[in-house]
Amino acid sequence: MTVRQQWILVGVVVLVLAGGLFAGVNIFADDLYPVGVGSKAPNFKAKDLQSRAPKTLADYKGQVVLLNVWATWCEPCKAEMPSMEELYRSYQPHGLHILAVSIDDYVTEDSIRAYAKDLGLTFEILHDPTHAIEKAYQTTGYPESFVIDRDGVIRRKWIAAADWNAPGSRALFDELLGTRPPMNEGAGAVP
């Protein structure tokens, strides 16, 4: 083999290795680019159980979104729902959208609707029985929640039930929505 042929062979090997690396990066991109605070929120598609139409995160572009991944069998999920509903009622007039995505795969959509109705939930309930949202957001537990700002960036991530009416939670939504904290009557708050 001549020197020229050796260099051509080396060039081919380098190109094959570079191509393999490029393909590997694209195939395993989820593992290389974790979803977390400061990252762009991945788009997803799930069925809205009220309208029965598919919804995507892109439908809420430019909006503040609390994305909650939950299941009907999850007791911590159920425990946090009342505070999430209270947060929604306080901040929905200011533009907050709550997307609660049920990942139940062995429960009917009617059962999920009844569950939400029994809890008095008025925010959007979506359903993803394929668990695609879990893969996209790399969730590790239930409930798992993501606060997404108007630019589509994840600002906070919670794994486990949260008190959505805690001062820290409300301060975050006040900041993102450009609102002032609600006044408590009789609490001596000064405007």
Where does each model-flagged region fall?
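Short, internal strand/loop/helix patches
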Residues: 113-151
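Thiol-/selenol-based redox modules, centered on thioredoxin-like
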Residues: 147-191
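Thiol-based oxidoreductase modules, predominantly thioredoxin-like and allied folds used
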Residues: 95-109, 121-131
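Conserved hydrophobic packing residues within short motifs/helices of P-loop NTPase cores
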Residues: 65-67, 99-101, 146
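N-terminal targeting signals for export/organelle localization
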Residues: 1-47, 167, 185-191
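Conserved redox-active cysteine motifs that mediate thiol-disulfide chemistry
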Residues: 69-86
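A short beta-strand-turn-helix
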Residues: 44-65, 88-91
